[in-house]
UniProtKB/Swiss-Prot annotation:
Principal subcellular localization: nucleus
Domain bHLH: 285-344
Organism: Saccharomyces cerevisiae (strain ATCC 204508 / S288c) (Baker's yeast)
Protein name: Retrograde regulation protein 3
This protein's encoding gene: RTG3
Function noted in UniProt: Transcription factor that regulates CIT2 gene expression. Binds to two identical sites oriented as inverted repeats 28 bp apart in a regulatory upstream activation sequence element (UASR) in the CIT2 promoter. The core binding site is 5'-GGTCAC-3'.
Length: 486
């Protein structure tokens, strides 16, 4: 309750200071209105009907500057003794003195269109009953109202006395607008942080934070005032602060607003969500997070071990070394997987050795095949000559059966002939073992090999002779009689 009373007393004091400052501003504005001089002609008259809405862009810009200046004055009163003690913070009087030396508020000397609405007039005393933005509109008979309510002839005279170069001064607008824009942004942040507490002012103010910007205030002040960015001939009438965006333009006001709104939060402080937790709660959250990570890791390990169990053959996994059936667990699965991988590695090594041996054998056989292909003409000639001799001998045996001994002698002669040309054949084949043997015992070895080679033909000839002539060389007719009787 004491806090509410103190807040109300402070608010009352601020309102009194605001009233006093408003009176000072009223007197200063009245002094700024100059009377027309006769040495100017009508060439400098600017008709409001030449622009949409009946107001020139210069009028619109000056109205915005005037509103920002007024908000800056209110902000200086609401900031308290701390803002007044700072020598670098401009007050309302110093703001106006700087603005008066540069501009004379063109909206005091220009008339609005016939259909334009007059400015809403609200008393400062209605700040506790109406919305805050309406209380910050004109709290007195402003020079704009006076200019709209004066006779037409006087307004024409005032407009005629304005120099042409004075209407288009932009450097003065930059300084004034940047200064007032900073103050208006500080006003909105200070009201949000200091005055507008929900306990004491929720019933007195219908505060809307978005209504304190220049665009929203200008829309409240006069519905037909357009923003300077969309006005007619914007390149000629707008200041460089609107065209180029200086340091203190509304786009960069977030620095001052954030510094005022977050004055209680230091650069190294934690957020409010974590700042309200105790040490036990922080430790508990850390432990829960660690447990969740550990649980996820164990689940992944279990899943991969299960996949390994599907790769190992069941005969190796489900039976122990003694052949007894067992139920595999994680340790058994890992052990049998290692054994199975070692077994596969050994198989690969054995297969590599066998493959190497087979490739060497294939190479050796290919070399032998090429050497045999080179000796094929000699072997063909040998078989052709031996075939002719055999055919002649067989014809002689068939024609003259009594010439069997001669046939045997012919066969022996053919063997001798074969013995004469056979050694070069063995030398061309390249059998080194046989070649060395033939050099030491040429006749003996070759005779034995030829005897083995021709033994089949000799045995066949002897069987035929026994069949035809009998064992004791008797008459063939007797042999046939014995064969028939048998």
């Amino acid at each position: 309750m004491m806090n509410n009373n103190e807040s109300e007393a402070e608010n009352q004091r601020l309102l009194d200071e605001l009233m006093n400052q408003t009176k000072v501003l009223q007197e200063t504005l009245d002094f700024s209105l100059v009377t027309p001089t006769p040495h100017h002609n009508d060439d400098y008259k600017i008709h409001g009907s030449a622009y949409p809405g009946g107001e020139t862009p210069a009028q619109q810009h000056e109205k915005l500057s005037y509103i920002n200046t007024h908000n800056s004055n209110d902000n200086n009163n609401l900031m308290g003794s701390q803002a007044r003690s700072n020598s670098q913070t401009p007050t309302a009087s110093t703001i106006y003195e700087e603005a008066e030396s540069q501009s004379s508020y063109l909206d005091d000397m220009f008339r609005t269109s016939q259909g334009g609405r007059p400015v809403t007039q609200n008393s400062i005393s209605s700040i506790g009953q109406g919305p805050l933005r309406s209380s910050y509109s004109m709290a007195y008979d402003s020079p704009v109202d006076r200019a709209m309510n004066t006779p037409l002839q006087q307004q024409e005279g005032l407009k005629a006395e304005l120099p042409h170069d004075f209407l288009f001064q932009h450097g003065t607008d930059d300084t004034m607008y940047n200064l007032t824009d900073d103050l208006s942004s500080s006003l909105s942040s200070s009201i949000n942080s200091d005055m507008m507490t929900p306990n004491t002012y929720s019933s007195s103010f219908s505060y809307n934070p978005q209504s304190l910007g220049p665009a929203s205030v200008s829309s409240t002040y006069s519905p037909k005032v357009r923003s300077p960015s969309s006005s007619f001939r914007a390149g000629s009438f707008l200041s460089s602060s609107f065209r180029h965006g200086s340091i203190n333009t509304p786009r960069t006001r977030h620095t001052s607003i954030s510094s005022n709104m977050t004055e209680n939060i230091g650069p190294g402080s934690v957020p409010k969500i974590l700042g309200g937790l105790t040490s036990d709660e922080k430790l508990r959250r850390k432990r829960e997070f660690h447990n969740a990570v550990e649980r996820r890791r164990r689940e992944l390990i279990k899943q991969k071990i299960k996949e390994l169990g599907q790769l190992v053959p069941p005969s190796l996994l489900n039976y122990d070394d003694l052949g007894k059936q067992i139920k595999p667990n994680k340790g058994i699965i890992l052990d049998r997987t290692v054994e199975y991988l070692q077994y596969l590695a050994e198989i690969l090594e054995i297969q590599a050795r066998k493959k190497k041996a087979l490739l060497a054998k294939i190479k050796e056989l290919e070399e032998k095949k090429s050497s045999v292909a080179a000796l094929s003409p000699f072997t063909n000639n040998h078989h052709a000559s031996s075939g002719q001799n055999n055919s002649e001998n067989s014809e002689e045996r068939i024609i003259d059966i009594r010439s069997v001994p001669n046939a045997l002698m012919n066969e022996q002669n053919s063997k001798a002939e074969l013995h004469n040309w056979e050694p070069p054949l063995y030398d061309s084949v390249g059998n080194h073992n046989h070649a060395g043997t033939m050099e030491s015992h040429p006749h003996t070895n070759i005779h034995e090999e030829l005897k083995e080679f021709l033994s089949g033909d000799l045995i066949e000839a002897e069987d035929n002779a026994k069949l035809m002539f009998g064992d004791d060389n008797s008459n063939p007719a007797d042999y046939l009689l014995e064969f028939g009787s048998g």
